[in-house]
């Protein structure tokens, strides 16, 4: 059974050798990238966006699924350590861009498309976070 990490169904520690697969729920457009940088980045930071884009780029466009990878390789690509990855992954989970599922030492990262600008500004949490980070 796969457990949803974001819902707190399981406590876990990420290890460098843990394997993961990425599932992308939809293909990204140039508009999505603009929304990520203009609306989400001020809230979660550029490193979280870089992690999202790096994970997205590991997915095959025709299947919306990646091959099995390990965290050590991913962290080498990103040039960060596991603690920094975990902190920024949690930011991505907090704004609904990623969900993490775990079974034993295997993870699945599910990537979600960013909300369009209209939906973003109608989301009370995201709208408030953006306002608090950018001001008026």
Question: Where on the chain are the PLM-derived regions?
Answer:
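Non-catalytic, interaction-prone regions of core transcription and DNA-replication machinery
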Residues: 35, 102-103, 124, 132
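Short, amphipathic alpha-helical interaction segments positioned at domain boundaries
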Residues: 113-136
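Short recognition helix of helix-turn-helix/winged-helix DNA-binding domains
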Residues: 1-64, 69
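Winged helix-turn-helix DNA-binding recognition segment
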Residues: 58-109
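Intrinsically disordered, low-complexity segments enriched in small/polar residues
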Residues: 10, 38, 50, 107-110, ...
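General N-terminal targeting signals
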Residues: 53, 61, 86, 102, ...
């Amino acid at each position: 059974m796969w457990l949803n990490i974001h819902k707190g169904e399981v406590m876990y520690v990420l290890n460098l050798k843990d394997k993961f697969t990425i599932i992308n729920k939809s293909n990204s457009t140039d508009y999505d990238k603009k929304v990520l940088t203009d609306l989400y980045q001020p809230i979660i930071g550029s490193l979280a966006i870089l992690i999202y884009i790096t994970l997205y780029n590991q997915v095959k466009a025709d299947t919306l699924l990646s091959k099995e990878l390990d965290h050590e390789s991913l962290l080498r690509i990103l040039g960060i350590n596991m603690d920094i990855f975990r902190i920024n992954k949690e930011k991505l989970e907090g704004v609904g861009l990623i969900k993490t599922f775990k079974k034993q030492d295997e993870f699945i990262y599910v990537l979600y498309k960013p909300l369009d600008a209209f939906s973003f500004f109608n989301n009370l949490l995201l709208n408030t976070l953006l306002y608090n980070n950018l001001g008026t």
